[in-house]
Amino acid sequence: MSEKEEVLRQISEIKNHLVDKETFFPYNYNACHVWAVIAVVMTLVMIPAYEYSITFGAGLIFTLVTIGFVVEGSLTKKVNKSYDIDDCTKRQQFIMKNFFMISLFLIILTTIFAMHQLYGLIILIWLFLISLGYFAVGFVLNIKAFTQMAKFNIIISLVLLVVGAYFDLFVGSDSLFLTLTQAVVIFGLAVAPSWIARKQQKEELSSGSCSV
């Protein structure tokens, strides 16, 4: 074994020793940008799709969510390779499984609510439950911006749920209330997460350049 190979082997052993592959959580923030795009598309096309056909709407939403998870999975594997991690860590699997189960539950709820044309309620339920997922991500990654964003989304979704229920605003697809909830969701699940992810990427780049 050459001297260079020996040095590389020692570096790899040190890295493996320092990185707990069971609990470590490397994260590719490009996934946030992908989910932001999907959130915008889903928010805008979900209601027309379900109005066209319940089956078509459910299939379209399931397809978009599946695309999101496939892309995020590939991005996760990419960032894991930089830490010599061949598979997902336990924390990554935990978060991914939670988001996937939440998404399946949401698709079922959405289909049921769409049968009764409760479109405003559908949008708010997505905001509430996906924000719970972002709260978990913020907690695991120790990113206060994610947890604060999630708390804000949860609070505003609960407020709108109370207002919508009190004034009976959930039914229909052409109300001002629905437009308001769609705008809130686009900001809360697309604009805000993408902005936070971009900020985190810049911080990682700056810290990386400083350490060189």
Where are these regions (language model features)?
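C-terminal ends of transmembrane helices
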Residues: 20, 72-88, 134-141, 191-198
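Membrane-proximal helix-loop-helix units in multi-pass membrane proteins
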Residues: 95-150, 155-156
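Structural signature of hydrophobic alpha-helical transmembrane segments
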Residues: 58-67, 115-128, 180-184
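Terminal transmembrane helical module of multi-pass membrane proteins
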Residues: 136-212
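Transmembrane helix-loop junctions in multipass membrane proteins, especially transporters and channels
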Residues: 47, 51-55, 77-85, 115-119, ...
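Membrane-embedded alpha-helical transmembrane segments of multi-pass integral membrane proteins
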Residues: 38, 42, 67-68, 109, ...
